[in-house]
Amino acid sequence: MNDINIVPYFEILEKINKKKNIKSKLHIYSLYNFNPLVLENYIKYFLEQHKINANFSKNAYDQIDQEILSSKFTKRIRNHRFLIIGSDINKKIFFNLNLVDQYFENLKINLKNILSKTKKFKKFNLIFFNSPTLLTSYYTSKSDFIKIQKKIQNFNFFLEKQSKKNKHLILVDIDNLSKLVGINNFYDQENYYVSKIPYTESANNYISQEISKIITAECNDRKKCLIVDLDNTLWGGVLGEEGIDGIDLGKTF
């Protein structure tokens, strides 16, 4: 992934609040363990560059488990084209190994529940955040820090395996994005303390553009390509035995 142009947030607000000629809306259901206001405004802006008018569901943040376990969850997401699950381990301030295990186990259960409840949906994609590395080792011992990083790697590997088995599951590689931006430049600690909005302007640009690319690609019609093995048909078969009479070929054959 190459460097991107960073769009300031004030420009985003100015442009998304202007009236657009885009009539149809794309419905997106989203659940996060942080305040997604800024991130979703960025996603909305970048989707509008592709003539896509995104409408995000209004859900309370940090209610992922409760929402997915709700008996009404399937009904709520049925009319949405995309479901985004964004959970960031660096916004869960714990460095206890058992709690980390529980955190990842909950995410695995949530993922399996969603895939089970949506397997009969025709036009539907689940966009799921993988886990970044820990922001700091300050609050834990070096040995525990290494163990937690290993658990993160194992969880991300689990997600990759699931995405290969489920065509409707698409991963957002937050781990890689955090390394591109720089883990220390990825999070805005002061803003998170005030408003529970975790990411810096640069991080929001990178994450939102990645998500908008995913959504745009899924919404656009895919072209099909037919590959013909001419070596064994025309050249070694018809042309080799019959000649070129009756076959329309260009002047460069």
Residue ranges and their predicted role:
Residues 1-251:
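Extracellular glycan-modifying ectodomains
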